[in-house]
């Protein structure tokens, strides 16, 4: 039995949006789900969906009606949205878990203590085909929380301990610019290297904002996102939003050394490596100049490096007899996002 889909008219009557923005156009949501071709990944009668900060939940109801997953849980604790969800979905298969998605304990309580939502574990040789995470991180805390989630993918913890769990995440367009920045981009930073290292992330949809051109033409051509009107979001004012499809990839990166190398070099992201490399430790320039096989690599700036090149430099760093104690390093990993 289908569930009621909240209308634009009813959703815009919610008094507080708590600084978040939501796409409220059922036709565009349907286009998005068609584009994602989720049936090729998931066994729908076995799929469990965890929807974080669902807000007015129009997208949630549409997903439920199209795919009819085994379980659909909405996690939200914001009072006006909680009331709206209860008014619209009481007595349906849509389950509300009234906790804050920001808190780590919300997940441990839900999964381990209360057993309200218990995903199975799968091997990391493919995307988990019975567990999907959806989220809206367009509010003030969104970018920082998204960076934490990317780190969790790399560390294979949080919800990613169950396998390679796909995430469909709404973020501010500016955040999408940052995490999708390619080597050579002026805004290339640690967050985009993390995204490249641990995920295959695609731009699924974005608004027709005046800043759309900040995405590279090659990215727009390759990802072919759905472009929707800024009028289809509520609230209409403020910064535009984008939808990212985050597919975790399996990796065997030496995380501690890789983290040290990438964050130190990217502080000097526009400085050629032959100079910036000394930031890894005293004597670094001489050591790396001797060990790096492709001497042209040392002429590159950190912002121009691919993750593969960072991994290569990390392997050299790891074999350095006089490398510094990386555990005595106190540089903030997200310093470039502040």
From Swiss-Prot:
Gene Ontology BP terms: methylation; transcription initiation at mitochondrial promoter
Positions annotated to bind S-adenosyl-L-methionine: 23, 76, 100, 136
Domain of life (superkingdom): Eukaryota
GO CC annotation: mitochondrial DNA-directed RNA polymerase complex; mitochondrial matrix
Subcellular location: Mitochondrion
Major site of localization recorded for this protein: mitochondrion
Entry GO MF terms: DNA binding; methyltransferase activity; mitochondrial transcription factor activity; RNA binding
InterPro entries listed in its UniProt record: KsgA/Erm (IPR001737), Mtf1 (IPR016586), rRNA_Ade_diMease-like_C (IPR023165), SAM-dependent_MTases_sf (IPR029063)
UniProt entry keywords in alphabetical sequence: DNA-binding, Methyltransferase, Mitochondrion, RNA-binding, S-adenosyl-L-methionine, Transcription, Transcription regulation, Transferase
Enzyme Commission code: 2.1.1.-
Stated family: Belongs to the class I-like SAM-binding methyltransferase superfamily. rRNA adenine N(6)-methyltransferase family.
Function description: Mitochondrial transcription factor that confers selective promoter recognition on the core subunit of the yeast mitochondrial RNA polymerase. Interacts with DNA in a non-specific manner.
Species whose genome carries this gene: Lachancea kluyveri (Yeast)
Lineage, uppermost ranks: Eukaryota, Fungi, Dikarya, Ascomycota, Saccharomycotina
This protein's name: Mitochondrial transcription factor 1
